[in-house]
Amino acid sequence: MTHCCSPCCQPTCCRTTCCRTTCWKPTTVTTCSSTPCCQPSCCVSSCCQPCCRPTCCQNTCCQPTCVTSCCQPSCCSTPCCQPTCCGSSCDQSSSCAPVYCRRTCYYPTTVCLPGCLNQSCGSNCCQPCCRPACCETTCFQPTCVSSCCQPFCC
């Protein structure tokens, strides 16, 4: 059946709780023929505005293009570059590519994720902090948050 999710929150089609707590944009979900409506294959474009559940983060928000535009501090139960979200090598310094430091963390050159080598991210890993995600999801340690994040950020 096509267009069974417009609006998305029809219980017989998409499962109301899925549409409301995961996809958030009911009107943008138009199909759910073979898979549950709120799986990434159905809601990948709308699931991240905002992304409010770990399942959304794990399945769709780890792509740099998605992370930079939608992931909120309260989105994931664990940071988006941890193994449960982005792969088993994400938090290992030996294989943490610059992309995780520069794209996933929102900041082009100055923010390091735990495990990322300083030479890949720059020496001032937490400065400046321009989004709440840096304070709450990326920087972890209070010493980092209190010493580098701007007041308007945290």
Curated annotation (Swiss-Prot):
Q: Which domain of life is it from?
A: Eukaryota
Keyword Transcription assigned to the entry: answer is no
Query: Which InterPro entries does the protein's record reference?
Result: KAP
Keyword terms of this UniProt record: Keratin, Repeat
Region (15 X 5 AA repeats of C-C-[RQVGE]-[SPTN]-[TASPF]) residue spans: 8-152
Q: Give one Pfam hit by family name.
A: Keratin_B2_2
- Keyword presence, Repeat: yes
Extent of the sequence repeats? 8-12, 13-17, 18-22, 37-41, 42-46, 51-55, 56-60, 61-65, 70-74, 75-79, 80-84, 85-89, 129-133, 134-138, 148-152
For this record, the Gene Ontology CC terms, alphabetical, are: cytosol; keratin filament
> What does the UniProt function comment say about this protein?
In the hair cortex, hair keratin intermediate filaments are embedded in an interfilamentous matrix, consisting of hair keratin-associated proteins (KRTAP), which are essential for the formation of a rigid and resistant hair shaft through their extensive disulfide bond cross-linking with abundant cysteine residues of hair keratins. The matrix proteins include the high-sulfur and high-glycine-tyrosine keratins.
Oligomeric state and interaction partners are given as: Interacts with hair keratins.
| Family that this chain belongs to | Belongs to the KRTAP type 9 family.
Write down what this protein is called: Keratin-associated protein 9-4
- To which species is this protein native? Homo sapiens (Human)
Q: What gene does the UniProt entry assign to this protein?
A: KRTAP9-4
